[in-house]
Amino acid sequence: MKLHELKPAEGSRKVRNRVGRGIGSGNGKTAGKGHKGQNARSGGGVRLGFEGGQTPLFRRLPKRGFTNINRKEFAIVNLSTLNRFEDGTEVTPELLLETGVISKLNDGVKVLASGAVEKKLTVKAHKFSSSAKEAIEAAGGSVEVI
């Protein structure tokens, strides 16, 4: 390969389409805007959601629900994920963060019962589902709510 043989990547050097520059270009005269009307004008076009005067969809549908400003977002950990730790390990939210099981703590860690745990672990978390608590204790481990 030599310097004079280098070519830009396919499609990376697209030529700008200059509209309104003669009929031979295929985009002359009306520049692809058609004849007259709101969309042909400078600054023309309708606002987002406008349906030509018909009551727009977002106004036809009823309002529903609300956003709870006190909502707590827990980092979810399933039992199947806990099997990666050695027998007898104390599993804490900090350890879960370090090992990359969870990306951030949010409002705490909640352990759910998806999968099965085969190791004896001491699990410390902010919340447990009742079935997850039973499964950990059945495997000989212990549960501690922080």
UniProtKB/Swiss-Prot annotation:
A single GO BP: translation
Stored InterPro entries: Ribosomal_uL15, Ribosomal_uL15/eL18, Ribosomal_uL15/eL18_sf, Ribosomal_uL15_bac-type, Ribosomal_uL15_CS
Biological classification of the source: Bacteria, Bacillati, Bacillota, Bacilli, Bacillales
Entry keywords, A to Z: Ribonucleoprotein, Ribosomal protein, RNA-binding, rRNA-binding
UniProt-annotated stretches for the region Disordered: 1-52
Quaternary state and interactors: Part of the 50S ribosomal subunit.
Gene Ontology MF terms: rRNA binding; structural constituent of ribosome
Organism expressing this protein natively: Bacillus cereus (strain ATCC 14579 / DSM 31 / CCUG 7414 / JCM 2152 / NBRC 15305 / NCIMB 9373 / NCTC 2599 / NRRL B-3711)
Statement: the UniProt record of this protein carries the keyword RNA-binding: yes
PANTHER family: 50S RIBOSOMAL PROTEIN L15 (PTHR12934), LARGE RIBOSOMAL SUBUNIT PROTEIN UL15M (PTHR12934:SF11)
Function: Binds to the 23S rRNA.
HAMAP family referenced in this protein's UniProt entry, alphabetically: Ribosomal_uL15 (MF_01341)
Example of a GO cellular component annotation carried by this entry: cytosolic large ribosomal subunit
Official protein name in the record: Large ribosomal subunit protein uL15
One Pfam family it belongs to: Ribosomal_L27A
